[in-house]
Every structure is written in structure tokens, then in C-alpha cells.
Amino acid sequence: YYNQDVEVWYDPEKAKTMLQEANFPFDQTLVFYISSGNSVTERIAALIVQDLQKVGVKVQIEQVDFPTLMSNMLDGKHDLGIIGSGGTMDPSESREMIHPDSSVNFCQLKDTELTDIIDKGNAELTFEARKPYFDEYQVKIRERSPMAYLYTKNVLTAYNKRVSGVEVENFNSLNWSSWNWDIDAAQ
């Protein structure tokens, strides 16, 4: 579903101009919540802070235990935060992260346009029919930038050739579609 027309850009001067136009309070220090004890998140947060400082944004990293992080993020008591999430290659899985009524809408989005686009894509049955909706979704997410998809881990998946019904493209850590598996005892 990757939309190659959505450019990834890095333009500190443009970012600074956009913040100035939005009357961003440069004298305010933002609190950036991260989960303690995760060295990858700590390094990523440090890099993000460096980039924000380049455009004049003051940021203080606050390491908290995971329950506190989740509570702050869910209650909207945060300026910035990093939450890892599992998922699949299907963009419809991000619906809950952006739906106004969702319990995991960490960005506190109130606009339903993005979820409406996902719902239209989900109503379609084929990849070809769904792709235009998810292309549009990626464009809108990029325009609004309420969140950033930072990285995904490389994962190697293997299974015994006796097992059939395995849908590798739908693998994630939460859903292995094991109810579709069948084991050929003859092999």
C-alpha cells in the first residue's frame, strides 16, 4: 500500500516558518514523554530533540514508567511522546490511532475525515479497489502530520512447509491467523 508519491521531506527552515505562522510559543518548553528503560526510544527521542532545537523549539525529555506514559498520552497530558505499536502492512490498522472516539487516539485528533477515508477503503474487497483510498490517507496524514511513522523493525518469519493457510503478509505480533492453519500429517 506504500504511496511513492508522498514525499518524505526534511526542511528545518520551512518548519520554522510554519511554526512562526502558527504563532508557536517558542518561549515554552515542551515535555517529551518516553518510556524508561528502552534504549532505542531514548536514542530516537534524542535525535528528535536535536531536530526540534534546530527550529527553535525547546524540549525536555521526561522518562517515565510505561503505565504513566500511557496514562499521560491517553489523557492528553503530553506535548510529545513516543508510543510503539504493532500492526501489519495494511494501513487500515491505524484507524484506531486516529479515530476521535478511540481509546488509543494519542494525537487527540477530532477530525473524522481520515477515518472516513479508511472506512471507504475497508468497504472495498480487492487491493486494487482499496489502494486509492489508502493512497489518499497517506497524503492527508503527511499534510497534517499529527504523528510520524518513525521506523519498523525487520522481521524474519519462518514456518514448517507442513503448515498451510499461513498468510505471511498479514503477520504481526498480535495476529498470526492461526485459525486458518492446517497441518499436513502425511509430510
Regions found by a protein language model. Give the residues of each.
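Conserved functional loop/turn residues at catalytic and ligand-binding sites
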Residues: N23, G56, K77
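Detector for C-terminal structural segments
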Residues: S36, V40-V49, M70-Q187
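Structural transition elements
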Residues: Y1-Q20, N38-E42
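Short, flexible coil/linker segments at domain boundaries that flank nucleotide/cofactor-interacting
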Residues: L19, P25-Q28
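Early extracytoplasmic/lumenal segment of secretory-pathway proteins
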Residues: K58-M70
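Structural motif corresponding to alpha-helix initiation and N-cap regions
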Residues: P12, F66-P67, D135
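Short, well-ordered beta-strand elements
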Residues: D27-G37, V59-E62, D79
